[in-house]
Amino acid sequence: MSDIMDRVDNSTRKFKLGDNIHFEISSSANTQGNSHQIPRKQSQSTNSNHQEQSQQARNQSSQSNTNTTSRKKRKKHKKKSKISTVQAHLNNPEDDYPTSRVIKQAPNGDVIVESLEDEDENHHHHEYEEHEDSCEYHPSSKSNTRKNSSVNESTHNKIWDSASIEEQQRLKEFWESLDESKKLDLVKIDKDSIMRMFKNETRHHLQQQLSSSVSSQPQQQQSQQNVSTSSNNGSSSGINNNSNNNNGNNTNSCACKYCGRRNSIIEEELESIYDNHFDDIIDFIHEVRDINDLNALPGLLFGGFHMLEEERRLQKRQQKYKEKWNHSHHSTSVSPQPESQDNKQLKKSQDQNEMKAISIEDEMDKFKSHLAKMSISNSQSNPNQLSEIHLQLKSEDGNLTGTTESQLFNKLLDPKLFEALENMDLDKMKEMSKMDPKNLNNVNILEKATSLREIVRDLNNADRSSLQKGISHVSNMGKFFSNLATLNNAQNLPEIVASGGLDDQLSKGLSSFAEDLLKNDGNSFIGMMEALSESRTAREELLKETVISQNPQEQKSVSIGQSDQSGDVWVDDDDENNRVDVEIHACDNPHHHHHHHQHSNKQHDHHHCHNHRHRHRRRFEELDDEHDQENEDEELEDDEEDYYDEYDDDEEEDEEEDEDDDDIEEEGASDTESEISEEEKMQEIRRLFLIQVIKLFQERLKNAYKEKLSQDRTQKLIEELEAEENAKKERELKKLKQKEKAKEKKRLQQLAKEEERKRKEEELKAKEEEQRLQKEKLKAEQKKRKEEARLKKEEEKKKKIEEQKRKEEEHRKKVEAQQKREAEAKKLKEERRRKAEEERKQKEEEKKQKELLKKQKEEEKRQKELLRKQREEEKEKEAARLEEERTKLMVNDDDELARQIEVEKSKLSAAVANNPLLNHLYQPSPGSAPTTPSTANLPALSPLQSASAKLMSQQFEQQHLQQVSQEKLPQTSNIQSPNQQPHPSISSFQFSSEYNSNASVFHNNSSLLSNPSIMNSPRTTSTNLLNGNSPIVPNVTTNISLGATNTSNLSPWSSKSRLNSLSNSTQPFIGGNQFTQTNTASFNGVGNAVQQSGNFSPFNAFSDPLVSDAFKAAGPAGMNSNIWLNSSNVGNNSGNQSGISAPTTTSTNTSSRNNSIWGNTNPNKVTEPSLLNNNNNNNNGLISVESSGLWNSNGGNNQPARSSSVTGISSNLSTINPISSMDIELIQSTTFNCFQILQNSGQLEFGVAPLMKLFQNVKTILNKPSLTINQFLNCCTINSNVYIFSLKYDDFGNVTHVEVAYKNVPRTSPPPPPGNIVQNQHQVSSPSFAAATASSSSLATSNVPLGFINSGGSPTGLFNDININHGGTSFLPPIGESSTNDAGSSNVGNSGFGRRLWN
């Protein structure tokens, strides 16, 4: 089949339909079409190979065409072509015009004339000469016209497109795995499918021509050999063909008879042929359905048709054997002959051998297919070293013995032979031979057969690669089996056996064969299994000689049957058809394949375009019976003789062509149709249809394989998913099992532990019980011993007791006498000590009374002096008032103001007298304590309670006298030199003498308003806000410098409070003058106390010196300035002595002070500070202004001008809602009480009270709804001798928290820093405690004024008047202090924060 495909694909298939109409179907288009179907990955790597393969295909096609047409055209006369020389040009003008020529048309329309002989010669010298170096070929010895050809890679690609070796192997395995029904469906021949294949191929051929014509000129010249056009006999037909092809290049269809009608004619002709010769084609296809034909295909169709026909062939052989057997049995029964016992045994053994031969014959085809598979797999696995089998047809003069040897040796390796030898009972045959004395010689033969069986066993078990050495043993074995075959075919076999001839022949052959086989250990013959061949010609010659040797004609069929039966023992059905010789060639070219093509019984010429020396051999198809085979042999010989005769005639006609050229032209046209054999035409048609059938089968096989592959992949995916799911379930199950095992293990461990615990408990109990019993036993013994000892001791004790009683009685009497004496002595001593203590206490009490009386006398004296001064001042004020009234400028305003002041004073007195909250507010339990200690860690002192109206009226007279005397006496400065002893003024501790029931003005000695120390302001002298008198020690105050500042209505509640607080006028580090401490003198004011807070406070960020206090304002520039009466005459240097630059005055003369509240107008006006006037004019950097307004008055002509910096209260005290000094002190005391209440109730936040909560409580207690937050903060910022107010700011400069504490209270922890260490301004902590510790030591030695009791660390207050409760008990004891202790004395040592509000 491969041979037919090779011839059909590589040759131009020609059909002649009528006169001068030739068409051909070239395989070049199909080749190119198939080459385009190769995948891109393979086409890139094999591009050059495809060009070589297409060139090979063209050479093969033209050579085959030349061989077939030259033989036919030598017998006919052809006309010379008449081509117009006007339109033609010659490429080679020197060359002669060829007599045997082919006229073609190039894609560009040029006419090409080629010589057939040149083509033939050129094709024999083709580019495939490189294969001569790599392959060896042996010349044929029978016929020059029968050559063996190989299918190269181009044919391989044309048939199977892009199928690689792996794909071919997979398709082959897929074909073998199909069942018979599926295979029948795939190879089923359908007319529509075949005709569709023809039409598609024709269209593809035309498209290929069009694409090749559009390509470039070099490609056109190369492709003109690929696309073969129909040849024409005349010049006119050639010209028409030129024009038609030019038209065909532009369009796919043409109406001319050469192009347009060609496709339809071909299709109609093919369809007609298919309808008329369908059965013939089917028969032909069935004829070529043989294993060797299909094996010649490139691997994929291996075993395809053979497996379909295998069962039919087996049945056919069995039927033939039955017919032969019946015929032989009938012939023997017709002419019976007496047979001896030996002949019967021989016949019986022959029958057994024949039956075994049938089974061997049935299995040979399968074995051959298996060997072919092995050879193909070996060739695929080793592409560089292919062991290729060339089946060579032996010539008539060849060595028949060598062919028979190869055949018989190959049969020796047959597994069926091995099975037959294994099934033979040689021992039993030996016994039977021994029993017959005539067959004693057969015993040796059977022994040799036993050795042969062992050898065959070794051969089948040996390695196949090592059996190539066995070729040298072919001759010996061939001799043995050839003799055996001759004996089996002979008619006188019983006589030969009886005479011992069989013994000699078999023993010689077996002995030589066994010796050669044993020398190689049985490993030298298996290599021949890969080179199994069939030797049909040799066996046919043997059969012919056997038939000729048989003279009786009636025994002809019997002898033929016997020869076939005997031959079937060693030869299968394929050996009847072929006679081959085995040649192994090592080929280095991996793409060079050697295939053995089979010729049909009809002779034909087929020449390949290779320079290889391939041997073509005849292939005789399978016959229905032996008579058909003999007839075929006779026909074959006749065909060969006819072929030789025809070849000789062709040579003679070639010689005559040169002489009678004109005659040939005239006679050739009429003899063309008659010369083409109808049989050859049908043969070509068969081949053409066979190619389409193969392509159809290939397409079906690939589609089935793809479908099967898709199903397998789908199934594999499903299996993988199921496997994955199962694995997942197994993992989960495994996890569950592991968990269960772990639980079980844990449970067992717990059980073991529990059992161990119980066991230990039982052991412990047993031990305890044993110990208890032992203890009880010991106790019983001890008890017994103790009882005995007790009885002895009791007796002894009784004796001792009696003796002891006697001694004790004597001793008691002695002790009683001694005690009496000691009691009397102690009583006398105690009485003496009591008397001495009483005397000491009496002396101390007398001393205290004397000191108190002395102090009282001094205080009375001072009060009288003060009262005198106040009266004088009052007279001056009264005179000034009368003078002011005479001016009639502000009569109505003064009356209204006096009335308002009186009303406010009465309201305030009534509110203080009638407010029970001051006495009974928030009385905590005795065990309550503050939850949050204060930041300063100072002892909590009792708050100042509001005095009743009655108490104020009782003491007003005394206070009035003290005011008068106070104006006359110089006030003691709070700032003293280091050498001076602290001597505070009496008025600095007076709280009960600040109210006057008969006067409408405030006292000028407000102790709470002296010493203004606002936040972190520099140390200044004490200032009386009401009268402005501030005597200053010059030698101390001159050393204190302070840059005067001008603050105008600074308030944290305004929208620009942050800007105001950070303005240049108030920033301590931005202003030109920074306050510094220049001396280390201890001061008696608040400014002297320096406190460095080391405790945690959430408001430490506000102590940054860059952040100015919004409420911090400089004190009054004139320390003696009075907001009500601004005309006070101090010295020229009074302003400078207080550390503040004094304003420039117009006169240096002093004048008397004007004590009038309204002030008297002096002729010489000087600038005075005004509470409501903020415009100041100062030559020292301060602004001094002329006083104007209601409260501005000039004290005298020569009164010095004072620099005025507005205090915190000055911006808020207006005529609409004024705040008096009494209100300021009351607000400060109430604020302290509210702070203590919040502290005791645990409502403080980090030791400080929220501002709004404290403000609301103060406003509620004082019943002052009109009190604003600015007024409250200004009251807190005014310096006080009793309290210290510390304001806490947020990041925006707003006050959020307030801390209140007593002033002048000794610190407990940490100790105060030394007075001579200057604190770093960047590390100043809470401003209100900045000067709290410097004067603590000086305050300890300060004198206590009248009306106060300095009990321990508690400062003097409003309600601890010395005149109340024997002069030693305050009117209301301080917070947390009791008037008496357990012994009845005053509790003078209990002070500090954390005390209860009231006792």
Curated annotation (Swiss-Prot):
- Predominantly, its location class is cytoplasm
The superkingdom of the source organism is: Eukaryota
Question: Which terms in the GO cellular component ontology are assigned?
Answer: cytoplasm
- Could you tell me where the Acidic residues compositional bias lies? 622-678
Source species, please? Candida albicans (strain SC5314 / ATCC MYA-2876) (Yeast)
Where does the record place the region Disordered?
28-105, 119-155, 202-249, 318-353, 546-574, 589-681, 722-894, 949-990, 1134-1178, 1373-1399
Provide the alphabetized UniProt keywords.
Coiled coil, Cytoplasm, Stress response
Q: Where is the composition biased (Low complexity)?
A: 53-69, 207-249, 1134-1156
Subcellular compartments? Cytoplasm
Point out the coiled-coil segments of this chain: 708-896
Lineage, please? Answer: Eukaryota, Fungi, Dikarya, Ascomycota, Saccharomycotina
Q: Which InterPro entries match?
A: NST1
Name under which the protein is recorded: Stress response protein NST1
Polar residues: compositionally biased ranges: 28-52, 140-154, 331-340, 547-566, 1157-1172, 1377-1390
| Basic and acidic residues bias locations | 341-353, 722-743, 752-888
- Functional description taken from the UniProt entry: May act as a negative regulator of salt tolerance.
| Basic residues bias spans | 70-82, 591-618
**Which family does the entry's similarity section mention?**
Belongs to the NST1 family.
